[in-house]
């Protein structure tokens, strides 16, 4: 079984100059999900929205081509792809010749799908969209919509996940609201390098205490876990402690190595958010 410790994270790595799909390093989701009480099917839907800003290859005449890639990985895949391995994989395209962008897109879709669905009884595919340079100026920047929790003047003293900070008002009428924060920070599971993010929480149900929610989000500050795992932990803590009727958690993390990862989890099927970067991304 692949584990994060066996990946290229935190290690000196050689950069392949020719296409090599074997560089992709899938890591099972199940182990970390078991830590937060998920055994078997997860109680949410969603996806991990990746943006690759450093994608380049050669055309058949050897001229470099560039594109931005939007990649959608369903959360029901049995694996995630470790991000440094994904960067190394993308770099292996740099000196490889392809007929056109559609050939690159098809190769990305096939390779990533194989990695994240590996061993699944009914494998499916990931979504891959390439943005050509002439469309770069149509890539928007927009902050997450919602009421900012960061306006609250709270005292913060806990910097490891503290779900006991989450409370809700169960004896009053349910509410529907969307709350945001730019204060999410966690650390890479293996290297301890800081990961900076913004988070949006939309729910219907007993009203969640906003001060406690902000303190809870801040409590991830010294926590070592991958982006996808942090968002699922937030979802499960809110789901079990605040008992919403509906819940959506969506985080957008700043890029590293030319990649950003933006996990989205929802209790009910709904339209996937557009992969639109924030100013910090």
From Swiss-Prot:
Main localization, broad class: cytoplasm
Superkingdom of the source species: Bacteria
InterPro entries: GTP-CH-I_C/QueF (IPR043133), NADPH_dep_7-cyano-7-deazaG_red (IPR050084), QueF (IPR029500), QueF_N (IPR029139), QueF_type2 (IPR016428)
Annotated EC: 1.7.1.13
Pathway: tRNA modification; tRNA-queuosine biosynthesis
Subcellular location: Cytoplasm
Binding positions for substrate per the UniProt entry: 81-83, 227-228
Leader peptide range in chain numbering: none
Keyword Acyltransferase attributed: no
Keyword annotations from UniProtKB, A to Z: Cytoplasm, NADP, Oxidoreductase, Queuosine biosynthesis
GO process annotations (BP): queuosine biosynthetic process; tRNA modification
Family from the record: Belongs to the GTP cyclohydrolase I family. QueF type 2 subfamily.
Subunit structure: Homodimer.
Cited function: Catalyzes the NADPH-dependent reduction of 7-cyano-7-deazaguanine (preQ0) to 7-aminomethyl-7-deazaguanine (preQ1).
Identification of the protein by name: NADPH-dependent 7-cyano-7-deazaguanine reductase
Gene that encodes the chain: queF
């Amino acid at each position: 079984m692949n584990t994060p410790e066996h990946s290229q994270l935190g290690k000196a790595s050689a950069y392949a100059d020719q296409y090599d799909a074997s560089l992709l390093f899938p890591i099972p989701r199940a182990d970390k999900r078991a830590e937060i009480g998920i055994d078997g099917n997860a109680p949410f839907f969603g996806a991990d929205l990746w943006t690759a800003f450093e994608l380049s290859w050669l055309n058949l005449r050897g001229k470099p081509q560039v594109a931005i890639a939007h990649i959608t990985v369903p959360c029901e895949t049995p694996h995630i792809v470790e991000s440094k391995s994904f960067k190394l994989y993308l770099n292996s395209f740099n000196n490889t010749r392809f007929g056109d962008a559609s050939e690159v897109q098809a190769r990305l879709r096939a390779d990533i799908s194989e990695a994240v669905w590996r061993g699944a009884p009914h494998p499916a595919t990931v979504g891959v969209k390439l943005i050509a340079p002439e469309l770069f100026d149509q890539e928007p920047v927009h902050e997450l919509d919602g009421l900012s929790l960061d306006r609250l003047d709270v005292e913060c003293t806990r910097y490891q996940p503290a779900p006991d900070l989450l409370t809700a008002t169960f004896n009053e009428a349910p509410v529907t609201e969307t709350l945001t924060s730019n204060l999410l920070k966690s650390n890479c599971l293996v290297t301890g390098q800081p990961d900076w993010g913004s988070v949006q929480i939309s729910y219907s149900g007993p009203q969640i205490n906003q001060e406690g929610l902000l303190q809870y989000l801040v409590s991830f500050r010294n926590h070592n876990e991958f982006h996808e795992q942090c968002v699922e932990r937030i979802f499960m803590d809110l789901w079990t402690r605040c008992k919403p009727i509906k819940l959506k958690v969506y985080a957008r993390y700043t890029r590293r190595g030319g990649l950003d990862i933006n996990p989205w989890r929802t209790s009910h099927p709904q339209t996937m958010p557009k992969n639109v970067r924030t100013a910090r991304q």
